[in-house]
Amino acid sequence: MYDFQGALKDIKNKGLYREFRNVNAAQGPYTVIDGRKMLMMSSNNYLGLCDDIRLKRAAIESIRKFGVGAGGSRLTCGNFELHRELEERLAKFKDVESCIVFGSGYAANIGAISGIADKNWVIFCDRLNHASIVDGIRLSGAKLVVYKHCDMEDLESKIVRYHTGKSLIVTDGVFSMDGDVAPVDRIVKLAKKYNLMTMVDDAHATGILGEKGRGTSEYFGLKDAVDISMGTLSKAFGVEGGFVAGKRKLVDFLRHKAKSFIYSTAPPPHNMAAALEALNIIETEPQARKELAEKSVWLRNRLIEKGFNVPKGVTPIIPLMVGDVNTAVEFSMLLYNEGIYIPAIRPPTVPKGTSRLRISIMASHSYEDMEFALKNLVRFGRKLGIIP
């Protein structure tokens, strides 16, 4: 029998053991964790919609009409009108022909990749892509070729070496733990040069990047350039779910081939209703997106000025690099004791030796909130010798 206890002991000895914190209130700039009021500085609730009254009303009205569950998969009895409406709206929002909604972003990635590719494919994958992308490739049986993070020279050399008739380049649009934006324009150029398909995971870009919040394609001014565009409803949208958007024939194919779609109970109607309301807000209230960008730049620049190892960037994900696992955990705990919630991110989520605090900004954070966080980050950063 497998030695679970021994494996857990090894995890603890490496400083990698995780314990759950219990959230006792809605997520906003402040929440309640284990009974304590905390400044939330690590949520993916970028536009502050998780607790928006309009989304809650939409969900409640849907529950009154449709109940709390879908009752079956989309291909049996669980296909509600709200699913169709959201898919049509998302396709229009992403400026593509069609869209398919999954229960989560993870399900969208593994379903799309394993549904499209098989052992005859070669898939080129950025080294820092999300785990769901890597799992989807492994599930498909395709040959996995990893290229250096955002390194187009390395990608091209590997395309020349490994490219076959059926090949795909897949990348995060915004990398979830680093906050940097993939050079999607250059990836598309390489794909056209060598006749490959492209897939972009825009989980952390949808609703955030681009003039209308459509994601990395809009950010780079690309039209009909990315073959497969994935997004989530659980970040800027503040709800739950994932989707894949693209050509009508692609989406129709995935309805018949994506196992995580076929064999899962459909997302509950109230999630779709809340997501539709979130989309209304994203399309009609660009000010929140503008404020998010301004606040993200403000805090990032202040941290750099104070001497922290923080890369430049344009997204609300701000990685404060620490390196050592135990130091990152201690830093996080010192902040927690002061009422600031920023968990330490450790391997295997990030590569060994790159443990960090993943700070993320919400449009609903005030500058006073960020000043309070900054003051304590500097205070404890100096105490731990992270900054002079």
Curated annotation (Swiss-Prot):
Binding-site residues for substrate, renumbered to this chain: R18, H130, T349
Signal peptide from the UniProt entry: none
One record GO biological process: biotin biosynthetic process
Cofactor(s) needed by this chain: pyridoxal 5'-phosphate
EC numbers: 2.3.1.47
Organism field: Acetivibrio thermocellus (strain ATCC 27405 / DSM 1237 / JCM 9322 / NBRC 103400 / NCIMB 10682 / NRRL B-4536 / VPI 7372)
CDD domains listed in its UniProt record: KBL_like
Keywords: Biotin biosynthesis, Pyridoxal phosphate, Transferase
Name of this protein: Putative 8-amino-7-oxononanoate synthase
Entry-linked InterPro entries: Aminotrans_II_pyridoxalP_BS, Aminotransferase_I/II_large, AON_synthase_class-II, AONS_Archaea/Proteobacteria, PyrdxlP-dep_Trfase, PyrdxlP-dep_Trfase_major, PyrdxlP-dep_Trfase_small
GO molecular function: 8-amino-7-oxononanoate synthase activity; pyridoxal phosphate binding
Reaction it catalyzes: 6-carboxyhexanoyl-[ACP] + L-alanine + H(+) = (8S)-8-amino-7-oxononanoate + holo-[ACP] + CO2
Enzyme class (EC, first level): transferase
Recorded superkingdom: Bacteria
Function noted in UniProt: Catalyzes the decarboxylative condensation of pimeloyl-[acyl-carrier protein] and L-alanine to produce 8-amino-7-oxononanoate (AON), [acyl-carrier protein], and carbon dioxide.
Binding site for pyridoxal 5'-phosphate: G105, Y106, S176, D201, D202, A203, H204, T232, L233, S234, K235
Pathway recorded for this protein: Cofactor biosynthesis; biotin biosynthesis
UniProt cross-references to Pfam families, sorted A to Z: Aminotran_1_2
